[in-house]
Amino acid sequence: MSRFSGALQLTDLDDFITPSQECIKPVKIEANKSKTGSKITIQDDGSYMQATSSGLQKLEKVEITLADCLACSGCITSAEGVLITQQSQEELLKVMNENNLAKLNNQLDAVRFIVFTVAQQPILSLAKRYNLPAEETFERVAGYFRKLGADLVVDTKIADDLALIEGRNEFIERFNTNRQTLPMLASSCPGFVCYAEKTHGSFILPYIASTRSPQQIMGVLVKKYLAKLLGIAADRIYHVTVMPCYDKKLEASREDFFSDVENCRDVDCVITSIEIEQMLDGSGVQALQIVEKAPIDWPWSTGRPPVFVWGHESSGSGGYSEYLFKYAARKLFNVAVDHVEFKNLRNSDLREAVLEQNGEVVLRFAIANGFRNIQNMVQKLKRGKCNYHYIEIMACPSGCLNGGAQIRPTGGQSQRELTAELEALYRSLPASNPENEAVEMVYTTFLDNAGDNNMRKEFLHTSYHPIEKMNTALNIKW
């Protein structure tokens, strides 16, 4: 069963496979067509040879990359086979083993600096799976990665904080100067972004926030900021992220996040909660408790945080709506909001918070999780009946804590019960404050060093691309 979010899964299933469901990447053939025909033979080594009047010619294997799939209007299932090899635990272990061997043989030119970035949601998923406190879980996961050969193990908090700050600034600017692009839609969910690009294209893309997701902000920090601090070339760093959903693999593979200057991706490999569980099981670690703990690294400032697992009150997907609501209330209307009350609407995955002044609603925010609510919101937008200013929108029901690659429930527990426990655990964690010393240092020494906002725009923001569907006669069902 596919673990991609519902927004990316194939829904039109029947016995007729149309080109939109198959891989429809066109193959460019350089050779001219032969008027006399040709003969193709398979050699003993498995290669293909084409015999023509001009002689024998070895045929090259057709390769379709994940980037090709992202630029195609076909369904996302076409990419799953590629993901297995390019973004998998097998590929990660292969790289780690090769790197350890290069270190052992003193082949310094072949050694890469390996950085693991771990999101909050996988830590909570693993904590529930192995019945450990969240902070201890992170330390033992760090110990496991260190044993594999990791050089640094960091959390995503600094990238989460930057995403919140850039998101709030973008919202205030739109509210004051460009209200036709409201509601602003959160951009951290790659499942929703990919769905929007392929299904609704140029209509919906202006509404999506340009702020990068925390994963891709972290990619910039590791490959550009941290690389400079450590004196390491960006292409010598192998950056691994641990995320709660498979859609993050697609996000990391977008061409927007490949640097032509450094000739490398911001994120080289994405693995998920369930893959970490499989890796532990595969290495004979049946209980995370037996893994030796290791400290989480903090290269961003001199002051080390007291904890490394943080939470938000409103949602398990990063707290975008809660933080932006509080900031907008204070910045735009001079109202201090200590607690944002999100009320359920049609279902628990669609919630709303409002700010009123003199009996008038001046701010209306929503949290919309799951494909059903995404579709409803899009239809409201198209009919001009969407009166929200901001929507935290996630493809998975219940958001990122219930991501498609989170560890499955055991012992007869339902998915709903497990998700409720994860949400309660997330809300019990120390509240994150994005305005802190580390964030200020990154802005001062890196992003604002040039004296303007160009680096902020280049490194913390992105753009989206409508993907037109290819209509051919083969789409006709007889």
Curated annotation (Swiss-Prot):
Residues bound to [4Fe-4S] cluster 1: 23, 69, 72, 75
Taxonomic superkingdom: Eukaryota
Residues engaged in binding [4Fe-4S] cluster 2: 189, 245, 396, 400
One GO term of the biological process aspect: iron-sulfur cluster assembly
Gene Ontology molecular functions: 4 iron, 4 sulfur cluster binding; metal ion binding
Keywords (A to Z) from UniProt: 4Fe-4S, Iron, Iron-sulfur, Metal-binding
Record family assignment: Belongs to the NARF family.
Primary role: Component of the cytosolic iron-sulfur (Fe/S) protein assembly machinery. Required for maturation of extramitochondrial Fe/S proteins.
The protein, known as: Probable cytosolic Fe-S cluster assembly factor CPIJ010948
Species annotation: Culex quinquefasciatus (Southern house mosquito)
